[in-house]
């Protein structure tokens, strides 16, 4: 994985190599922290817009929540693509008939239209999961050094 961001490249590749060790939400937060280092002026919503979510098309039993993360540059901005093993419309956890998963497994020179279409829904679904998780995990709504609203 090559990046044009000099000294930050080892940090990106180290995160990409070890991403399987983290849970779904930990991985998203780590990737957002990495993007925050690259773009300190962006807010959480703008950083979250730099993430792209996909489902893993593999039919094998997943060994972790996150399959992989890849960092890429698009329109001069560093972005991240996360591939998850949980909650997908194709792959091992799919609620759809196996036909769709088998069709999503195939690759051709111009890509896979079935996978690309269903990934639109995966992206939207996974974009909703982190705010829901944060809402019901009181401790993650605070950053270090902050004082809670109840104490003000």
Language model: regions and residue ranges:
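Short secondary-structure junctions and interdomain/linker hinges
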Residues: 35-38, 42, 107, 111, ...
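The feature captures two recurrent sequence modes
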Residues: 1-94
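Short, hydrophobic/amphipathic alpha-helical patches that form generic packing surfaces
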Residues: 25-34, 119-131
């Amino acid at each position: 994985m090559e990046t044009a961001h000099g000294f930050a490249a080892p940090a990106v590749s180290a995160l990409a190599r070890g991403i399987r060790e983290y849970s779904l939400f930990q991985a998203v937060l780590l990737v957002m922290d990495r993007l925050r280092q690259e773009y300190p002026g962006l807010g959480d919503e703008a950083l979250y817009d730099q993430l792209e979510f996909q489902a893993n098309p593999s039919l094998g039993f997943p060994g972790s929540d996150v399959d992989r993360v890849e960092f890429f540059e698009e329109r001069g901005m560093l972005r991240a693509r996360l591939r998850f093993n949980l909650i997908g419309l194709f792959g091992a956890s799919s609620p759809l008939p196996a036909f769709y998963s088998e069709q999503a497994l195939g690759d051709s020179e111009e890509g896979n239209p079935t996978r690309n279409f269903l990934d639109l829904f995966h992206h939207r679904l996974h974009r909703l999961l982190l705010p829901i998780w944060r809402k019901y995990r009181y401790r993650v709504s605070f950053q270090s050094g902050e004082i809670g609203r109840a104490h003000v």
